Amino acid sequence: MGRVLQKKKNRSSAPKIKIKSGKSKSGKKKINVLGNSIIAQNWDKKLTLAQNYRRLGLATRLNAPTGGVEKGVSAGALNNISSLATKGKTAAQIQPSEARVERDPETGKILRIIQPDQAGDDGTIEVAGHKRRRTNPLDDPLNELSDVEDSTLRDTGASTDVVSALERQAAAEEERVKKRKPRHQSKREEEWLQRLVDKYGDDVPAMVRDRKLNPMQQTEGDIRRRLRKWHGNKK
């Protein structure tokens, strides 16, 4: 026979208390992107994480992009490259575009290819009765924002005020770490290490297994670090 109170809880419609986990639905650890005060002050809640990092001059991924990501080309480089001119053996990067093909109505052979600039094309197409830019047919405002930000960051070398502030903060933290005094071993810790060495010598795994001399169950790596420091202080 089960417990009556537990059965009532199972039948109840009241929501059960769930312990907050430090992991996301995908199983990865949750990261507080606003943990840094400088980033929190310059964060735009209307943009996604990738767009915010791009705007601030930061990288969302440390690894190189893989699959489905095309290397961007700055607007200045595109203006200097002609689709009809080649410079030696260097391969020119040609951006994909559209053109009209004029065919013979009888044979179907291609007579000529009309480029958009030759046909007086203004770079727009008609979508659902509305004229849209050929590069942005869905009229997505974030697409325009991303293009502008990408070209700006590439031209300026991704150097922003936020990056400079973060670099100064990191340099100050590094100086504080250098000024910290190293931890000195106490007299009791030195006596404890001396007893371990007198009994086991260099056999650190045996020191770990000793319940009397190692009541706090210090790990093998921890004891090795303490011994290394202890031997260094004796010299």
UniProtKB/Swiss-Prot annotation:
Record flagged with keyword rRNA processing: yes
**Pfam families, A to Z:** Nop16 (PF09420)
Q: Which cysteines are joined by disulfide bonds?
A: none
- Feature: compositional bias, Basic residues: 225-235
Compartment(s) where it occurs, according to its Swiss-Prot or TrEMBL record:
Nucleus, Nucleolus
One annotated GO biological process: rRNA processing
Say which domain of life the source belongs to. Answer: Eukaryota
* Family the entry assigns: Belongs to the NOP16 family.
Quaternary structure, per UniProt, is: Component of the pre-66S ribosomal particle.
What functional role does this protein have? Involved in the biogenesis of the 60S ribosomal subunit.
- Name of this chain's protein: Nucleolar protein 16
Say which species the protein is native to: Coccidioides immitis (strain RS)
